[in-house]
Regions:
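Short acidic/histidine-rich active-site segments
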Residues: 209-224
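Mid-to-C-terminal alpha-helical segments outside catalytic/metal-binding sites
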Residues: 8, 226-248
Length: 248
C-alpha cells in the first residue's frame, strides 16, 4: 500500500538543485498560441531561457490535445515545434525542442489510439491526462490498447487529481497495469495546494515517480520552479536514480 495517508511532512528547503541533474524537461507548453501555454514567440523564448538558466538542457514540449478546447493535431504540433526551433536558432539559444503531446483522456484520444496517430515522447512514452473533476470509469481497456501499439502509457501529474488524494489503491491499480507516473515539479512547492504536495511527497517516498516535468505554461511558473528546486524531496527523488529523464 502506498503511503499517502502518512502525516504530511514539513517541507524542507535546501539550496537550489542544479537541473542539469535532471537534464531533460519532458512536459512543457512552449509552442506559442496553440494551447494555454506560451501565447507569443517572446513568451516561448522567455520560458526556454528561464528553464535553461536552471540547468535544463533538452526539452520535449507537450501541447494539450483536447477535443473541446485544444484541437491540436500531429501536424500542428510538429510544425509549431519546428517554428520554435527556428526561433531558438535566430535567438542563438543553444538547445533542442522535441515534439510530443499531452492527450486528454476523451473520445478523441480513443480515436487517435485507433488510428495510431500519436506523438509519444522519444517514440515510446505516451503522455495523457485525466479530467480533474471526474474520475475515469474504466481506463484499463485504453491502457491495454496503448501498450498493444508498443507505447508505454504515462500519466501526467497523478498527484493533482482530487480523486486520488485519499485513494492510493487507485494509483496502485494503474501501476499494476503498467502505467508510468510523471510528477510536476511545481507540486513540490505547494503550487497546486497542500493535498497535491502531500501526494507528491508520498509518491517520492514510495518510489513510484518515473519522470519529472515542469508542465510550464507561463513565466510566473519560473519563480515556482525556483522554489521547487530547493525541495528536500526533489533531492531525494533525483538522488534515488529512478528518474528516466536523463535517458530522453
Amino acid at each position: 500500500m502506498f503511503g499517502f495517508f502518512k502525516k504530511r511532512q514539513k517541507t524542507v528547503l535546501r539550496s537550489p538543485l542544479d537541473a542539469r541533474l535532471i537534464g531533460v524537461d519532458m512536459h512543457s507548453h512552449l509552442i506559442a498560441g496553440i494551447d494555454d501555454g506560451a501565447q507569443t514567440h517572446d513568451d516561448s523564448l522567455a520560458l526556454v531561457k528561464g528553464l535553461k538558466e536552471f540547468g535544463f538542457q533538452k526539452f520535449w514540449t507537450s501541447p494539450h490535445v483536447m477535443s473541446d478546447f485544444y484541437r491540436n493535431s500531429t501536424s500542428t504540433i510538429v510544425n509549431g515545434t519546428q517554428t520554435l526551433n527556428d526561433l531558438l536558432v535566430k535567438a542563438q539559444i543553444d538547445t533542442s525542442i522535441h515534439a510530443a503531446a499531452e492527450y486528454y483522456f476523451d473520445d478523441n484520444f480513443m480515436d487517435l489510439i485507433a488510428k495510431n496517430d500519436l506523438l509519444a515522447i522519444k517514440g515510446e512514452y505516451l503522455l495523457f491526462e485525466f479530467s480533474y473533476l471526474n474520475q475515469p470509469e474504466n481506463p484499463f481497456p485504453a491502457i491495454e490498447k496503448i501498450k498493444a501499439l508498443g507505447y508505454k502509457p504515462l500519466l501526467a501529474h497523478p498527484e493533482r487529481y482530487p480523486f486520488y488524494f485519499h485513494r492510493p489503491d487507485l494509483l496502485e491499480q494503474l501501476r499494476a497495469a503498467g502505467v508510468y507516473f510523471q510528477l510536476n515539479i511545481n507540486s513540490l512547492a505547494g503550487h497546486y495546494g497542500p493535498e497535491s504536495l502531500k501526494v507528491a511527497q508520498g509518491m517520492i517516498d514510495d518510489n513510484i515517480v518515473d519522470f519529472l516535468g515542469t508542465d510550464i505554461h507561463k513565466t510566473s511558473h519560473l519563480e515556482v520552479i525556483d522554489r521547487a528546486l530547493r525541495s528536500e524531496h526533489l533531492y531525494k527523488l533525483v538522488e534515488s536514480g529512478r528518474l528516466i529523464n536523463p535517458a530522453l
